Amino acid sequence: MSIELILWLFSFASIMVLIGLTAYQLICLSDLEFDYINPYDSSSRINSVVLIEYALQGALCASFLLTLHWFPFLVMAPVAYYHGKLYMDRKHLVDVTEIFRQLNWEKKYRMIKLAFYFSLFIITIYRLVMTAVTLFIDEDANLVDTRTI
């Protein structure tokens, strides 16, 4: 199996997890808006997955940098920088006392991240299929060459 195929499979799985984590955060905020859960539970659930999301997105960005895939790296680098800046400024966690005031902004922020991750998902699926097809065609061509000898 090619390193590039492994990279795109890792990217596919990582982006699926990122979409799931962002959707989970959005569901927690919607439940809070409709008063299904209290602010403490909502903020503790969101805060428990924020660092996982940041670490996974940073690892994915670093893997694109290390494998010299410049376009995905340049697309993901500003988001990784923003996540790092939020973490360094200690603004990455949702505050229990401020969550109702920031509810609309937090939901918009998560929706934008969800749209961003979906666009990355489309790019990743395309690159995964192209890499798999190219790898399959190259192996098929090598197999035909060895049989003719």
UniProtKB/Swiss-Prot annotation:
UniProt cross-references to SMART domains, sorted A to Z: Cornichon
Residues that span the membrane, as ranges: 3-23, 59-79, 117-137
Bilayer topology annotation: Multi-pass membrane protein
Keyword Protease recorded: no
Keywords tagged on the record: Endoplasmic reticulum, Golgi apparatus, Membrane, Transmembrane, Transmembrane helix
Single biological process term from Gene Ontology: vesicle-mediated transport
Subcellular location(s) per record: Endoplasmic reticulum membrane; Golgi apparatus membrane
GO cellular component terms, A-Z: endoplasmic reticulum membrane; Golgi membrane
Cross-referenced Pfam families: Cornichon
Recorded GO MF terms: signaling receptor binding
InterPro entries: Cornichon (IPR003377)
Family affiliation: Belongs to the cornichon family.
Job description of the protein: Acts as a cargo receptor necessary for the transportation of secretory proteins from the endoplasmic reticulum (ER) in COPII-coated vesicles targeted to the Golgi apparatus.
Name this polypeptide is given: Protein cornichon homolog 2
Species this chain originates from: Oryza sativa subsp. japonica (Rice)
Organism ancestry: Eukaryota, Viridiplantae, Streptophyta, Embryophyta, Tracheophyta
